[in-house]
Design a protein with these regions (language model features):
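Short amphipathic, charge-patterned alpha-helical segments
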Residues: 1-2, 6, 68
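Eukaryotic low-complexity, intrinsically disordered regulatory regions enriched for acidic, serine-
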Residues: 13-120
């Protein structure tokens, strides 16, 4: 019954409210992906530093780990593409900021992946 309420409420939302909710949901996913990327970057730095960390078993994240993260970031970008801004500048700016943040995370992921590859 709770799901029915959510569906009914979404029909009563204005396009602007729906857009804000869609962008917020996407950004929530991106927040968790950013945390995951931070963990991968830290693991990469530990392994790249070598020495004590490497002798204690610090290993570089696998290439596939970075690829999966990149795929999920790409999916977040695609979901933002589907968000209808109803032609409102404020909503377009909100979506644009979210897109830029995801693109920056993709670049960070690519850089971390390159560092991990060099450290192997």
């Amino acid at each position: 019954a709770g799901g029915d309420t959510a569906v009914r409420q979404s029909h009563h939302q204005s396009p602007a409210d729906r857009c804000r909710a869609d962008v917020a949901a996407c950004m929530s996913t991106v927040d968790s992906l950013e945390q995951e990327l931070g963990e991968l970057e830290r693991a990469t730095e530990k392994a790249a530093a070598g020495g004590v960390a490497a002798s204690m078993g610090a290993t570089c994240p696998k290439d596939t780990t970075f690829l999966h993260l990149g795929d999920r970031l790409e999916k977040a970008l695609i979901s933002l593409d589907e968000v209808d801004t109803a032609g409102e500048d404020e909503l377009r700016a909100l979506r644009k900021g979210a897109v830029r943040r995801i693109q920056a995370l993709i670049e960070r992921g690519d850089a971390a992946r390159a560092r991990a590859e060099a450290a192997r």
